[in-house]
Amino acid sequence: MGRAKKVVLAYSGGVDTSVCIPYLKHEWGVEEVITFAADLGQGDELDPIRLKALDAGASQSLVGDLIEPFVEQFALPAIRANALYEGRYPLSTALARPLIARQLVEVAREVGADAVAHGCTGKGNDQVRFDLAIAALAPDLKVLTPAREWSMSREEAIAYGERCGIPAPVSKKSPYSIDLNLLGRSIEAGPLEDLMVAPPEEVFAMTSSIDAAPSQAQDIEISFEAGNPVAIDGVRLDSVGLIKEANRLAGRHGFGRLDIIENRVVGIKSREIYETPGLLLLIRAHQELESLTLAADVLRMKRQLEMQWAELVYQGLWFSPLKDALDGFMDRTQTYVNGLVRIRLQKGNAMVIGRSSDTNSLYISEMATYGSEDNFDHRAAEGFIYIWGLPSRLWAAARRG
């Protein structure tokens, strides 16, 4: 008896998910495999991917346009939360997984499947993200994970696929594993596993090299309403269009490349190469506007909770109660994050050079100036410092005694 009768497989067209189709049927006795591929703005033509799944043995090959919900329901909350895992990675890949899992469950319900499946390996983060999201949304559905159990190396998986008539999507000349969506690209494997090998220019697609980037700086203005980016240089754009334009501008100037060592959920360290020009640009601008519009104690607390928020998303806990509670805090603070930020793009840099908020700025020039317009009560500082330093004086006196 097979492990399931009808399975919906999260499908990308890559090695692992392609090999999963014949493997589920031939090795695990699954009667019917239906694939689902998500359009997340990766720019690929998805019809060849759909046909590839059918050629590999899928009974149905479904494609869903998830670009708008990806941006509205996942990217924008990440921008409002200034989400940077370990202070650097803006979660461009991690944000896509709960959305794909949610859609996978919906498709499974629609077609009457008794299981879902994915092609994640046993040492990556995505297996955790898919499994936890599916468990939170549909604990009754079985989750099949052939790539976690088959013990095949990448080369062996490619060979298995070729025996089943599946052409290999990579070659010895291009050994990299690449994941991409509207928010960015992640590149790993191959020569990049040597930590001292610089990523070759050929692995990048969204960003110019420093040499190729324009020498002339470009100043842009990003406008925000309630924490959401809504316009660039005064031109209002829908959320998807704004991300695309941010990608174009930042990428043209070579901003948005990351080469980092990352702590995976499963406990190992890995080298990750990312291109996330637009997302990093928008987070930087958003952070700056918050520094102008949020009270100091709110800002300090938010910075702490941002790290927690990013860790939850990275670790696959998008649908957790704690993540939901943190969303409430983030959303409440964004009421005041209205205004614009001016950024100078040049040769891989994005430097904030201006910020303003007509309605919510907490910067009072008469308080901050050292000029003749200064109306800060300097005499009040002496009493404040005395009270503020009282615990230190009492502690010092007790030690002397």
Swiss-Prot record:
Cellular compartments annotated: Cytoplasm
SUPFAM superfamilies documented for this protein: Adenine nucleotide alpha hydrolases-like, Argininosuccinate synthetase, C-terminal domain
PROSITE patterns for this protein: ARGININOSUCCIN_SYN_1, ARGININOSUCCIN_SYN_2
GO BP terms: argininosuccinate metabolic process; L-arginine biosynthetic process; urea cycle
Binding residues for L-aspartate: T121, N125, D126
Coiled-coil residues: none
Keywords: Amino-acid biosynthesis, Arginine biosynthesis, ATP-binding, Cytoplasm, Ligase, Nucleotide-binding
Catalytic reaction annotation: L-citrulline + L-aspartate + ATP = 2-(N(omega)-L-arginino)succinate + AMP + diphosphate + H(+)
Keyword Cell inner membrane: no
One MF annotation (Gene Ontology) recorded for this entry: ATP binding
Pathway assignment: Amino-acid biosynthesis; L-arginine biosynthesis; L-arginine from L-ornithine and carbamoyl phosphate: step 2/3
Coarse class of the protein's main subcellular location: cytoplasm
Gene3D superfamilies: Argininosuccinate synthetase, chain A, domain 2, HUPs, Single helix bin
Residues at which ATP binds: A10, Y11, S12, G13, G14, V15, D16, T17, S18, A38, G119
GO CC terms: cytoplasm
InterPro entries reported in the protein's UniProt record: Arginosuc_syn_C, Arginosuc_syn_N, Arginosuc_synth, Arginosuc_synth_CS, Arginosuc_synth_type_1_subfam, AS_cat/multimer_dom_body, Rossmann-like_a/b/a_fold
Subunit structure as annotated in this protein's UniProt entry: Homotetramer.
Family: Belongs to the argininosuccinate synthase family. Type 1 subfamily.
Protein name, as recorded: Argininosuccinate synthase
Organism: Prochlorococcus marinus (strain MIT 9313)
